[in-house]
Every structure is written in structure tokens, then in C-alpha cells.
Amino acid sequence: MTAKPVAQFPGAIIVISMLWLAPLSALIIGYLLGSIPFGLVLTRLGGAGDLRAIGSGSIGATNVLRTGRKGLAAATLLLDGGKGAAAVLLAEAIQPGLGPMAGLAAFVGHCYPVWLRFNGGKGVATALGIILVLSWPVALIAAGVWLASVVVFRFSSLGSLMAAASAPVAALAMGKIELTVLLIALALLIVWKHRGNIERLRRGAEPRVGKSV
């Protein structure tokens, strides 16, 4: 019996297309949400200049704080975290189980936004928003590690690295294997984005939290 081409079964093509539609939509929505450069937009609207020419050049909340505008930094932190959370929630609304995929896409979007020639932030706040929706206890532990580290050492970058390392450990301890895999990926990307900070920490040249430029 001769097998018929798939093209002769339009119903099968439609079903296959529909199976791909939800994951693809989650990826696109996640990336586009993540790529919104709130820090850059807020500093420009607030008259604080081009964030990319300030401090580390990052578009995240820590660099916004270096402008001396604490309100803008807080708003950036909330919005960057919020877009990560929103990506997960929207993806779960499209199809349950797609949240982690959309969250990862949002994280990549923040770090590599197409609008800024793929030169974005370091993703810590966005990652926290993602984790908050997927597992608030893990998010609470990571935030606590970050806060404790910053209070003790006064380096946001060091706190971010320690928080990124603690998140997958906490998830694994809670038996959340799939979440652990996602958090390992996020942690590796966060370390990669902080490679300049790591070098400055090694040389003793990393600016401390709250230092204005």
C-alpha cells in the first residue's frame, strides 16, 4: 500500500500547526515582553540621560540607581520583574505548562533586546519575577540571599550571583526538578552577563551599591 503525502490530509496539517502555535506564541510574547527596556525608557523620560552611557551601561535597576534617582530605580526593578511574571502568566493562560518556556524567552529578551541591537540588561529582576510566579518560596529564598549579600558586602553584582546560585539549589531541595533545570539555565546566563562584574570584583574595581556617577 502506497503511503499518501501529508499534503493530502489537510486536517493533519492543521492539527500539527495548532500544536506549534501555542508554544510559538508563548516564545514570541515572552521575548517581546522581556525586551521592553524599562530602565532606559524611564531614565530618558525622567531626564536622567541615556542609561547606556552611565555607569556599567546596563539597562537594569542597579545602573538606574547610579543616576541617584531612587524612585526610577525602584520603578525599573518592579517593571523588569513584572514583565517576567507577566510572560509566565500569559503563557499559562494560552496553554498550561508553557510558563517556564515563556519565562526563559522573557529573560533572553531582557538580556538581548532586538530594539537595542541585542545589548540589554543582566536579567536578575526579570528572573526574580519569573521565579516568583513559578515558585514563590524559591523566589523568597533567592531574594533573601541577594539582600543579605548586598547588606554585608555592598555589591549588587555579588548579591545577584549568589542569588542566582541559590535558586536552583533551593528548587532542587524542594524536589522541583523541572524548575531546577530552568533555574540552572538562568543562573548560567546571569553569570555570563556578569562576567565584566566578576572581573571588576577580582580587581577590586566594582562600584558599590548606591554609588552615583
Q: How would you describe each model-predicted region?
A:
Residues 40-73, 197-213:
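Cytosolic, membrane-interface loops and tails of multi-pass inner-membrane proteins
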Residues 8-26, 82, 86-102, 132-138, ...:
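Helix-coil boundary and interhelical linker segments in multi-pass alpha-helical membrane proteins
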Residues 140, 156-164, 174-186:
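Loop-to-transmembrane alpha-helix initiation sites
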Residues 26, 30, 35, 39, ...:
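Alpha-helical transmembrane segments in multi-pass membrane proteins
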Residues 49-61, 115-128, 155-161:
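Short, non-helical or kinked segments that cap or interrupt transmembrane helices
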Residues 39-44, 109-119, 146-153, 194-199:
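C-terminal ends of transmembrane helices
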Residues 65-68, 91-95, 109, 124-153, ...:
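Interfacial segments of multi-pass membrane proteins
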Residues 143, 152-161, 186-188, 193-200, ...:
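RNase H-like, Mg2+-dependent phosphodiesterase core
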